[in-house]
Design a protein with these regions (language model features):
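A residue-level detector for the "anchor" residue at the start of short, highly conserved motifs
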Residues: 4-10, 20-310
Length: 310
């Protein structure tokens, strides 16, 4: 049984949204391929297999990006990490101590992490991602920094906006559920699931207000508005791969990241093949490949370090 968006995105009401980049190096010619047309998506990495957490003493600076290079990391084995416990009396907006612990959560490919922040906000951190946040929120804003992908269910607090910063994006909300995807900056989009958001970008002459079910795609200096099925954007935290009408390229990038495999297309034209495909994230890669291979026009082989689409 199946179990279950330099740019600024400001929420002007309760909303749910998705922001999306693709790695600049996602598509590159593979060295040593016998076929000239062979293309590799998402090379395999060797970054370890454990979810880790690093906690450091230091001042949390809302406007300066911090790089965590010191302090010891520890492996996280809990299915849910709760920072809300012991947070009484130290919520957002209370200065309290000037020094606050800074936490960096890191997930490898193939593993995700569910955590609850000190304000009660729930976060599902996807694989191959990093989330930096203060152990206790203080000041006018509740700010976190993300590299990768995470789904947020934000605790409502109209006096202290919740802010998700990425390298080229800032998303501000007052209390809602949304997904932020920021693995890279070559492609960007915002998808609104519910509520109302205003999107500002150097690519857009004036801010654009989205309606539920709309996605704003930004590629370089161009942008476009599309109507999409928003159901797919909430299913990851429920334990699914859900591709309602996605290209083989999009599907393979997701699978390669989750299972930490290089993805090779022997014929680039197959990257544009569209499929409807649903699977549980707990399934083995072999099971996923077998299911995909049963579809018309799909021929996939699984090697020890790569997935080959023929």
């Amino acid at each position: 049984m199946f179990r279950k968006l330099l740019a600024t995105v400001a929420a002007v009401a309760a909303c749910a949204l998705l922001l999306f980049w693709l790695w600049p190096s996602d598509v590159m010619e593979q060295e040593g391929q016998s076929k000239e047309s062979a293309i590799t998506l998402l090379a395999q990495t060797d970054d370890g297999d454990d979810v880790t957490m690093r906690v450091e003493q230091g001042e949390w600076e809302e406007t300066v990006s911090k790089t965590q290079e010191q302090g010891e990391s520890r492996v996280v084995t809990d299915s849910h990490v709760d920072f809300q416990a012991g947070a009484a009396g130290q919520g957002a907006g209370k200065k309290g101590q000037e020094m606050a612990s800074v936490v960096l959560m890191t997930t490898p490919r193939g593993k995700d992490c569910h955590l609850t922040l000190s304000d009660g906000t729930r976060v599902w951190l996807n694989a191959d991602s990093k989330l930096e946040f203060p152990e206790q929120f203080r000041g006018a804003r509740r700010t976190v920094r993300l590299s990768g992908e995470a789904y947020f269910e934000v605790a409502k607090d109209s006096r202290h906006p919740f802010v998700v910063e990425t390298e080229y994006l800032t998303t501000t909300v007052l209390g809602t559920s949304f997904n932020v995807r920021a693995y890279t900056v070559s492609d960007a989009s915002v998808t609104l699931v519910e509520g109302r958001v205003q999107v500002a970008s150097p690519s857009v002459r004036k801010p654009v207000v989205l309606k539920p079910g709309q996605r704003l795609d930004v590629v370089g200096s161009r942008f476009s508005m599309n109507t999409v099925n928003t159901y797919a954007y909430t299913q990851r935290k429920e334990g699914f791969f859900y591709f309602p009408d996605d290209t083989m390229r999009q599907i393979m990038v997701e699978l390669g990241r989750w299972y930490n495999k290089a993805v090779v297309f022997e014929d680039a034209s197959h990257m544009n093949l569209r499929l409807h495909f649903v699977a549980e994230r707990t399934q083995s890669l072999a099971e996923i490949v077998n299911s995909l291979s049963e579809m018309d026009g799909v021929n996939i082989e699984l090697g020890s370090n790569e997935i080959v689409v023929k």
